[in-house]
From Swiss-Prot:
This is Ribosomal protein uS12 methylthiotransferase RimO. Residues 1-110 form the MTTase N-terminal domain. Catalyzes the methylthiolation of an aspartic acid residue of ribosomal protein uS12. GO terms for biological process: tRNA modification. Binds 2 [4Fe-4S] clusters. One cluster is coordinated with 3 cysteines and an exchangeable S-adenosyl-L-methionine. It is an enzyme of class 2 (transferase). Gene3D superfamilies: Methylthiotransferase, N-terminal domain, Nucleic acid-binding proteins, tm_1862 like domain. It catalyses: L-aspartate(89)-[ribosomal protein uS12]-hydrogen + (sulfur carrier)-SH + AH2 + 2 S-adenosyl-L-methionine = 3-methylsulfanyl-L-aspartate(89)-[ribosomal protein uS12]-hydrogen + (sulfur carrier)-H + 5'-deoxyadenosine + L-methionine + A + S-adenosyl-L-homocysteine + 2 H(+). InterPro entries: Elp3/MiaA/NifB-like_rSAM (IPR006638), Methylthiotransferase (IPR005839), Methylthiotransferase_CS (IPR020612), Methylthiotransferase_N (IPR013848), Methylthiotransferase_N_sf (IPR038135), NA-bd_OB-fold (IPR012340), Ribosomal_uS12_MeSTrfase_RimO (IPR005840), rSAM (IPR007197). [4Fe-4S] cluster 1 binds at residues 6, 42, 73. Residues 139-386 form the Radical SAM core domain. The keyword rRNA-binding does not apply. The lineage of its organism: Bacteria, Pseudomonadati, Spirochaetota, Spirochaetia, Spirochaetales.
Length: 467
């Protein structure tokens, strides 16, 4: 499995591994021994497309005896083109209904030589899947996993191809999600990161719960899900990743503040602080409205004396959008400084065919967009460093991901604190002696939860000592 793209794609890769194992295939990390190499691709922006295509070319060149299957978003979006223009791919499989993968595998690996002429290279089912299934192999570090709660998106931001690739919004049933969490808890998992194209839209798709059902519960679909999760017994943490700001459900805040297993970490992709650009992106919000959301979040946790202290925000900014002027960009910088997120990701605009913004006028020169990206990243760096410095001297819990042996009898571990999401944020470098134990009294190892005191900051990472 050669994985590309986002956390949603990672869950798909894990589901595919489960399907393949049910077909009696064995997963291997060594491509030299593979009969089949699956490139689970990303098709979101141009750089990701190029990376995925190159992965297919490299896999076929390095392992000519293996068959190469292109799966994922690139396959979903461009199957009709790639089945002719990418002969290195022996098979192409969309992500609309993963349960149909065995059909394509049977075609790629016919039981009789005479069946070769009947091979169907491409299978792109309609977007009807809702991301459930067995995941025997988790591609994260120990005791942490992603839980996908939705597929598709109904927001139709003018720059975004996700609705084209993933289709309209579909929500997993609450029971299905809770049962999956319970299954992982039995396997000693600790951290669950809820993901989807937009968590705020959970249970608002046309085939989801009716408005009458949600009205009867007097809450949003996401709040209803969090209420159900809060009833699950056990020691675990829940992190919410990607909540669209235009319909942020404030009714989740009382649920989260009442249960410390919900981490006060909010991933809200604002994209811009300029009203004109926000509207051009087909979004309904405004900088002052977005800041009010953050104010509500911070006040909710402050009033309840949260053991975590201040909630932390991650966001995303897209610069160089068509028509973005220097004045517009300065409004975004101003918004960022008022927002004060701990983390933010920055990207330059990628012109994607079939999206509304593809035909927008006012193209921003590449050098200008890159200069704006550098400026917003520098502004964020200053904010991040100050916020990380505020943790120095405080005690936190660290989820250990891997061990690194240092000199003498001192050991190092890499891990994450509650305000660090997997892969995208900084890390905690943990110093400890062999006699130190984790919170369960066991030797410190990958997957351990360790109490530690923050001693220093090193760039975007923190240095800590086990206590």
């Amino acid at each position: 499995m050669d994985l590309h793209g986002c956390a949603k794609n990672q869950v798909d890769a894990e589901l595919i591994i489960g399907i393949m194992e049910n077909l009696s295939w064995k997963n291997t990390s060594d491509p030299d021994e593979a009969d089949l190499i699956i490139v689970n691709s990303c098709g979101f922006i141009n750089s990701a497309k190029e990376e995925s295509i190159n992965a297919v070319l490299q896999a076929k060149a390095a392992h000519p005896k293996a068959k190469v299957l292109l799966a994922g978003c690139l396959a979903e979006r461009y199957a009709d083109i790639l089945k002719n223009d990418l002969p290195e791919a022996d098979g192409i499989f969309g992500n609309g209904n993963l349960s149909l993968l065995p059909q394509l595998i049977d075609s790629m690996f016919p039981k009789k030589t005479s069946d070769e002429k009947f091979i169907e290279k491409t299978l792109v089912p309609p977007q009807i899947g809702i991301c459930g299934g067995e995941r025997p192999k988790i591609l994260n570090f120990p005791r942490s996993t992603y839980i996908k709660i939705t597929e598709g998106c109904d927001n139709f931001c003018s720059f975004c191809a996700i609705p084209i690739i993933r289709g309209r919004l579909r929500s997993r049933p609450i029971k299905d999600i809770c049962d999956e969490i319970k299954t992982f808890l039995k396997k000693s998992f600790y951290e669950f990161n809820l993901i989807g194209q937009d968590l705020a839209a959970y249970q608002t798709g046309k085939d989801d719960l009716s408005e009458d059902e949600l009205h009867r519960e007097n809450c949003s679909g996401l709040a209803l899900l969090l209420k159900s999760i809060s009833k699950i017994k056990g020691n675990f943490k829940i992190r919410l990743l990607y909540i669209h700001p235009d319909h942020f459900p404030l009714d989740i805040l009382p649920i989260m503040t009442a249960d410390k297993r919900f981490l006060p970490y909010f991933d809200i992709p604002f994209q811009s602080g300029a009203q004109k650009i926000i509207r051009a992106m087909n979004r309904n919000g405004a900088a002052e409205v977005y800041l009010d959301i953050i104010k509500n979040i911070r006040e909710a946790f402050e009033k309840t004396n949260s053991p975590y202290g201040e909630p932390q925000i991650r966001t995303t900014f897209l610069v160089g959008f068509p028509g973005e002027t220097d004045e517009d960009f300065n409004e975004t910088i101003k918004f960022l400084k008022e927002l004060r997120p701990l983390w933010s990701g920055g990207f330059t605009y990628s012109r994607e065919e079939d999206t509304p913004s593809y035909s927008f006028k006012g193209k921003v020169p590449k050098k200008t967009a890159e200069a704006r990206l550098a400026e917003i990243q520098n502004a964020q760096t200053s904010i991040t460093e100050k916020k990380l410095d505020s943790f120095i001297g405080k005690e936190i819990e660290v989820l250990v991901e891997e061990l690194i042996q240092a000199e003498d009898k001192t050991f190092l571990a890499l891990g994450r604190a509650w305000f660090q999401a997997p892969e995208v944020d900084g890390a905690v470098v943990l110093n400890f002696n062999l006699n130190k134990k984790d919170i369960d009294g066991n030797p410190i190892a990958p997957g351990s939860i360790v109490k530690a005191r923050i001693a220093a900051r090193n760039g975007f990472d923190l240095e800590a000592v086990a206590v």
